[in-house]
Amino acid sequence: WIMGHMVNAVKQIPTFLNDGANAIEADITFKGAVPTYSYHGTPCDFGRVCIRWEYFDVFLQTLRDYTTPGNSKYYEKFILFVLDLKTGSLNNNEVRKAGENVAKGLLKNYWNNGNNGGRAYVVLSLPDIAHYEFIRTFKEVLKAEGHENLLDKVGYDLSGPYLPSLPSLDSVHEAFKKAGVDGHVWLSDGLTNWAPLGDMARLKEIVKRRDSENGFISKVYYWFVDKYSTTRTALDVGVDGIMTNFPYVIIDVLNESGYKDKYRLATYDDNPWETFKK
């Protein structure tokens, strides 16, 4: 999975897809518990415009257009999107309400209330393992609305907080248990593109846990990868996905002699909740 990073304005969507992405990531900002904009703000990655945005509902409707067969904007290879949910400032009650609002927003504006909506898979990424109630409420709303089947298309990523230090993987696992999640787990690690590349120790730990006999992680992705050398290193570690500002870089590496026989671009038929066994 090649995930175009910080795709927050609708006009950016075809640009990233044409550059080689088969997935995108957008930043969802809230007013209270209400998801309002796809917007990142400053600071952001080097070389990017930080302030592009769209209204949340319009953004989801546009994603639906690009992922609904028969629509004039349909891209067959666009198979997944990540919603980076900026819930960091919300209290517990707001987190639960935010889960309800995001569920209703996706149901109405992306899934078209279950009537020929978008077909892409969705990963809900939350910045704090304490926000597991978001996931519980999200799931409850879809069940109550009679669309529990749509949960087959939804995965989850609990990734922080980053300060004072990242939670242990055991703590992350416990948060998923509290959320009622068993499977459909994506986990990530990474650095902004202006930071020096570290030793990827946590990434290696996540991959090892994914591949363990009792691993709770379905897929692992790394961000933000803009260099050819970093792409090769991440692939050598064994990631399933890469988030990038330059999808064509990842495509180029996938076509290199050392990688084209080991990796390929994911398609819609590849299950994003199934751990690949070598």
Swiss-Prot record:
EC number annotated for this UniProt entry: 4.6.1.-
Gene Ontology molecular function, alphabetical: lyase activity; metal ion binding; phosphoric diester hydrolase activity; toxin activity
Keyword field contains Phosphoprotein: no
Co-factor note (free text): Binds 1 Mg(2+) ion per subunit.
InterPro entries: PLC-like_Pdiesterase_TIM-brl
GO biological process terms on file: killing of cells of another organism; lipid catabolic process
Subcellular localization(s) per the UniProt record: Secreted
Taxonomic superkingdom: Eukaryota
Intrachain S-S bonds: C44-C50
The protein's required cofactors: Mg(2+)
Keywords, sorted A to Z: Cytolysis, Dermonecrotic toxin, Disulfide bond, Hemolysis, Lipid degradation, Lipid metabolism, Lyase, Magnesium, Metal-binding, Secreted, Toxin
Tissues/organs with expression: Expressed by the venom gland.
Residues of the active site: H5, H40
Family statement: Belongs to the arthropod phospholipase D family. Class I subfamily.
Protein name as annotated: Dermonecrotic toxin LlSicTox-alphaIII3iii
Organism of derivation: Loxosceles laeta (South American recluse spider)
